[in-house]
């Protein structure tokens, strides 16, 4: 799993970001992520999954800092939103500002960042 994770980041930094930079005519060095949490449940977060997520977050922060431009989680269940309210208190304000957790009311927020014709 982690080899694919690192491969993805290395591909972003060494190939995709430079290609996007050339095409846009300006520096592109971060990504915009939309995560649909429709099928997420609290039982999905086993201790093994939590451990892997923690390790991934640590490695990402150490080796690929500031690569997150924005992340919007849509259809987040209440339990996830409640946990986020606690967790974000332990994170840097700059990081928190890049993450939006939304329930089924996500469309207005999403359209603040993405043109409607670019969404499925």
What label would you give each PLM region?
Residues 1-120:
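Basic, amphipathic alpha-helical/coil surface patches used to engage anionic, phosphate-bearing ligands
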């Amino acid at each position: 799993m982690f080899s694919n994770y690192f491969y993805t980041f290395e591909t972003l930094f060494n190939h995709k970001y430079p290609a996007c930079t050339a095409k846009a005519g300006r520096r592109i060095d971060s990504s915009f992520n939309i995560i649909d949490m429709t099928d997420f449940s609290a039982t999905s977060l086993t201790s093994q999954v939590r451990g892997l997520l923690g390790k991934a977050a640590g490695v990402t922060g150490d080796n690929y800092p500031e690569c997150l431009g924005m992340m919007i989680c849509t259809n987040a269940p209440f339990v996830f939103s409640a946990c986020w309210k606690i967790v974000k208190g332990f994170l840097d304000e700059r990081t928190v500002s890049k993450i939006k957790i939304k329930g089924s009311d996500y469309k207005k927020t999403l359209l603040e960042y993405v043109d409607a014709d670019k969404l499925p």
